[in-house]
Amino acid sequence: MEAIIRTDKLEDLKAALSDNGLVHGMTVSQVLGYGEQKGFTEYVRGQRIETTLLSKLKIEIVSIDEKVDDIVNVIIKAVQTGEVGDGKIFIQPVERVIRIRTSEEDAQAL
């Protein structure tokens, strides 16, 4: 699954995910994007600056199917503010996982 979240919610999310033991790792990437939030306009030294792409974080987590709904609920509870710009969660299947170090596959590789 991928979750696009506000940058200031990362520590809350990390704490929530580690507290319940559902997730043993995740990948975090800085990304830019826009949706309903649309960006903002500010003035710097009298110059109008329009920011149309907002800084967000992309969280990538791979899990067994049985844990997906629980992980989604933890993510929502940890990062939801109720305001435009909270983000999105995308869930897609993963065909195969291989841990490079041990060659373990699928659930054992998670």
Give residue spans per PLM region.
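Positively charged, small/polar-rich N-terminal and surface patches that mediate targeting and assembly
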Residues: 1-110
